[in-house]
Amino acid sequence: MKNIFHLIITGGLVSILLVCCQSQEGKKQTESLYGKQIVAIGNSITAPKDSWAWITAQHFDMELTNLAVSGAQWTDYQGTTVDTNPKPVYDGVHTNNVISNQVYRFLQLIVPEGEIISEAEREKFHTSTPAPLTGLKTKNSTFDPTIVIISCGTNDSSNGKPIGDPSELDKPYQEADRKTLYGAINWAVSIIRKYSPDTEIVLLTPIQRSSHSQKLPMFVDAILLAGEKLNCPAINMYEESGITEAVEAKEHKYLYDGLHPNALGQQLMGEVVIKHLIDLYENKQ
């Protein structure tokens, strides 16, 4: 009886030690993320307080700065102006609700107070945004994000915006046409790298919807190609999120309106992002 009891205890201790080792190993793999800062840029799928971005930040105990705005798209409009309001002024249409303005808001947080952000000097400003555009980071600021994740593209597809030619990815970012998807991605990734070179930039593709779209997969492929050419991790949420057109067309299981994720859908997205970040930072060890 004593031998059996000894075996049970020993087996239990082995199990406990194994679990502890696995837990410590998992934490070690991503120790460079824990307690750090993460920035989310995107549209209405990312903007909610309990979105995949919040779920991801909570998992790693990271501080989240969410700059996403409902309705945003990658590509500029013909009349887009520099507009750093948290909710860009629409002037009747969504001309300023674009990723470039979210990136400018990010740059203001990372650039020292009073320093001019020269790229904006070439552009027109909305009357509500003072020119020149300058940094807002004070000497006491601790803002120093480890990761910026940009999740966008579904509104570009719905609005019929041009993907453009892949050659836009090879241009100096100042010459990239932000009215095309490729040009907008090149500009955003490149300018963030210029001002925050130690920050990892991750791209997310759109997820599937309940309604069929022939164009959306083309935008997904373009974002993946952009990630590859710009040496920027890109996560294929369209294929990996577990949210599918086939299921959502019959029942709103993960998308409450056929487009926007409910709590379960956001959880699925968060889990995919977490997995990829673990893989990304494990490979860096």
What is each model feature region?
Residues 1-9:
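Bacterial N-terminal signal peptides that target proteins for export
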Residues 18-20:
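C-terminal motif of bacterial Sec signal peptides marking the signal peptidase cleavage site
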Residues 22-28:
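Bacterial lipoprotein signal-peptidase II cleavage site
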Residues 34-40, 45-166, 170:
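Conserved SGNH/GDSL esterase-like catalytic core that processes O-acyl groups on lipids
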Residues 40, 51, 55, 59, ...:
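Extracytoplasmic/secreted proteins, especially bacterial periplasmic and envelope-associated proteins
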Residues 41, 45-46, 171-178, 210-213, ...:
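Second-shell loop/turn segments in exported
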Residues 82-84, 206-285:
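Catalytic His-Asp segment of secreted/periplasmic serine-dependent ester chemistry enzymes
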Residues 149-161, 186-221:
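Active-site segments of SGNH/GDSL-like serine hydrolases
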